[in-house]
Amino acid sequence: MIIIKTLSHRIFFPKFSQTFSSQFHQTLRFSISDRRKFSAMAGAGVDDFVKGNVFPNGVALITLDRTKALNAMNLDMDIKYKSFLDEWESDPRVKCVIVEGSTSRAFCAGMDIKGVAAEIQKDKNTPLVQKVFTAEYTLICAIAAYKKPYISLMDGITMGFGLGLSGHGRYRVITERTVLAMPENGIGLFPDVGFSYIAAHSPGGGSVGAYLGLTGKRISAPSDALFVGLGTHYVPSEKLASLKEAILSANLSEDPNQDIQATLSKYSSNPESEAHLKSLLPHIESAFSSNKSIKETIEELKKYQQSTESSVVEWANEALKGLEKGAPFSLYLTQKYFSNVACAKSKPENELATLNGVMKTEYRIALRSALRGDFAEGVRAVLIDKDQNPKWNPTSIEEVDENEVEALFKPLSPEVEELKV
């Protein structure tokens, strides 16, 4: 029997008590009242938060309009979003899809983390956890495989699930106001939403993506966003409305991709500054390569603190501060997981070489990680009490039990369905 010490019960593992199995299986029957309960957290109907319109020229537009929460996504928003995509993909009148945020402050700040954590604290067996991750991860796979042009206008904060909604799409438009980050280690989870797959295809054999995922580094320079591959086109914010209008009024041909590429080329430009991360690439690759353990990464960064180059010292100091904010267990898990995905990239027979395979594995990890005490503690310290002083368990990387980390990757128990994508 595999038991994760910090979990209050034995869920999701191949072997556990039949009594609990029966109880947990019952909780997976997701009722209307469950949906209403989760929706109530948002304070308004999903139709107010996710708006969909199809314009006469065949351009469909999704607008995330939950401004007070920086367009953070909850379960019903996920479901509504995917229903639009599914409907439009089979509608011959729809030629492409644009997604945007309702405010220049944010495209999407991520998942409604406080709502999920609150439900877990009320009931560790809540079916909402499984439903939220199922909705998110199937939506990500749908975006990545979307048959029609998918254009993300990533103006403002684009973090966590915001990168999931945009980073797997074909066209990723950034502005000088775009702020990109995966800060999940800082709340006791791990960088999910398929970011490990994006990271594996980043410069330096995936080391740049691993660096961003482990440290939670915020990318605000357009040149860096383009260098990493998180953005495909830089459009100054003063031109964004004109770009949108040009697409909404365009006479799209039988090959809308060609028309969209031409329009994006017209409004996009090269950032004024060079990519800072590009100049740091040798150091990032050395410290965050897939063959380095998290302990070795930290030791490497400490060596760089003694560099004669001030820019390298500054980078190393910042990276270490970023790592210090993460839960030790999360850091250990993230390094191992990202390394596995990066190493699988060149091995087609490996399930982790595909996004769908990555998301199936990620689903197992997410369901289990969300029930660890670190998640509730991280949300408390960062988002609720805001004392920025989480009490992690374990308290150091040296105390992390590798067997506990390995257990997160194992197939789910027969009573809990694997992700279907």
Curated annotation (Swiss-Prot):
It is found in: Mitochondrion. Its main location: mitochondrion. InterPro entries: ClpP/crotonase-like_dom_sf, ECH_dom, HIBYL-CoA-H. SUPFAM superfamilies: ClpP/crotonase. One of its GO terms (molecular function) is 3-hydroxyisobutyryl-CoA hydrolase activity. Keywords: Acetylation, Hydrolase, Mitochondrion, Transit peptide. It is an enzyme of class 3 (hydrolase). Its EC number is 3.1.2.-. Residues 1-41 form a transit peptide. Belongs to the enoyl-CoA hydratase/isomerase family. This is 3-hydroxyisobutyryl-CoA hydrolase-like protein 3, mitochondrial.
